[in-house]
Regions:
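Conserved alpha/beta core of the MobA/IspD/sugar-nucleotide pyrophosphorylase nucleotidyltransferase superfamily
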Residues: 169-215
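Nucleotide and nucleotide-moiety/phosphate-recognizing core
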Residues: 2-168, 177-191, 265
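Walker A (P-loop) phosphate-binding motif
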Residues: 4, 213-256
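N-terminal phosphate/diphosphate-binding loop that engages ATP/GTP or pyrophosphate donors
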Residues: 238-293
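Phosphate/Mg2+-binding loops and adjacent switch elements
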Residues: 312-373
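Phosphate-binding/switch loop-helix module in NTP-utilizing enzymes
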Residues: 290-317
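Short, charged/polar "capping" segments at the starts of alpha-helices
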Residues: 55-64, 258-260, 330-334
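C-terminal accessory "lid"/substrate-recognition subdomains
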Residues: 213-215, 243-244, 263, 273, ...
Length: 374
């Protein structure tokens, strides 16, 4: 197929999120909608339709804060489409965009599937060796079809219109009606097909995105005050993560200075004599002491550790993703940004909270390794 257009489904009530998903912040200064749009533009898609449902405020925000900031050439490739039939969910958005779309086929990307990649759509098109199809729809590891990540012909719009006058306006029902649907095995792409339904899903998806291009993934443990229990949380996490097979590093800030050597040792004497750096290697551990003019970058230290993941312990706001430690009933003193914070832990509830944290971190690490080495 010569040209593939892109439909971004950005509308929807987002009742579980409390705000439009499309405008949620993402990494690199992007929002979820600008992130999806950039994928289409970077793939040189010349026909991108953004479905906003019937949300005029959302459409205005996307136009003024995103589309108007693009180059003239990029702006010509993007159109906002409002639902011509109100309150029909994703199927209404699909109908409204297909009904006006000039391209021979459209990939559909839900705005709450931030790890979906354009390359997958082109791969799926290549796998179908004939043109007798109305839709190409992947199925996930669970065996369930994923119509929000499918490819559709515009001429099925008339069939979808007939469905919208009925009671069942689900995308899965629509697939049964339109027929000639090619199913694609996408069981190896569970993370790409995952979507963000709850705020917790969003927080951990951002955690993955923040860590995706780091040499060493990290997670910060912060607290607004001393003696809150940061070190207790860190040591508990280290123990539990090591137990499930992850090698863990710890970086800690100390603005008051510290001592890691013993008085009178050879390395201590060499350092006091003026050596800019000393190192010692034993059978089971290695230590390096470096003289600096100012405090070293904590982030740089995390990126040079030979481990799977680093925990950064600090009293500052930390580096996303962040776990914040509080005393019981003191959540009003939180210092981290809610968008960067994946968890809030009360020191008295470690037995309850740590296993869930470890599970999320394991899932993040598995997804990171799959995306880096697949």
């Amino acid at each position: 197929m010569d040209k593939l257009g892109l439909i971004i489904l950005a509308g929807g009530l987002s009742t579980r999120m409390g705000q439009p998903k499309a405008l949620l912040s993402w990494v690199g200064g992007e929002s979820l909608i600008s992130h999806a749009l950039r994928k289409g533009l970077d793939a040189d898609v010349h026909d991108i339709l953004i479905s906003i449902g019937d949300d005029e405020q959302l459409g205005h925000a996307i136009q003024t804060h995103i589309i108007d900031t693009l180059s003239n050439d990029e702006q010509e490739k993007v159109s906002i489409v409002r639902d011509s039939i109100e309150r029909c969910g994703p199927l209404g958005g699909l109908y409204s965009t297909l009904a006006v779309g000039p391209s021979p086929a459209y990939a559909v990307m839900a705005v709450d599937m931030p790890f979906m990649e354009m390359d997958l759509y082109f791969d799926w098109l290549y796998q179908v060796d004939h043109n007798d199809w109305n839709a190409i729809v992947p199925y996930s590891e669970s065996g369930k079809s994923e119509p929000m990540a499918g490819i559709y012909r515009p001429y099925i719009a008339s069939l979808i219109q007939s469905i919208l006058v009925g009671e069942n306006v689900s995308l899965h029902h629509a697939l049964d009606v339109i027929g000639h649907v090619e199913s694609i095995d996408a069981t190896d792409f569970s993370w790409e097909l995952s979507n963000i339904n709850r705020f917790e899903d969003y927080q951990w998806a951002r955690a993955l995105a923040e860590n995706e291009f780091r040499r060493v993934p990290l997670i910060s443990v912060v607290a607004s005050k001393r003696k809150t229990g940061k070190t207790t949380v860190v040591t508990r996490l280290v123990s539990e993560l090591q137990r499930v097979g992850l090698s863990v590093g710890v970086v800690k800030s100390d603005k008051h200075g510290f001592h890691m050597d013993h008085e009178g040792t050879d390395t201590d004497l060499a350092y006091k004599a003026g050596a800019n750096a000393v190192a010692i290697a034993g059978p089971n551990e290695t230590a390096i002491r470096i003289r600096t003019k100012e405090q070293s970058s904590l982030y740089d230290l995390t990126q040079h550790m030979p481990v799977d993941i680093v925990i950064l312990e600090t009293r500052s706001q930390g580096i996303a993703p962040i776990i914040e430690v509080t005393k019981e009933g003191h959540t009003e003193e939180l210092i981290s940004d809610a968008m960067d914070r994946v968890a809030t832990i009360e020191i008295g509830k470690l037995d309850q909270d740590v296993p869930e944290l470890v599970r999320h971190i394991q899932e993040m690490m598995r997804s990171l390794n799959g995306r880096r080495y697949c």
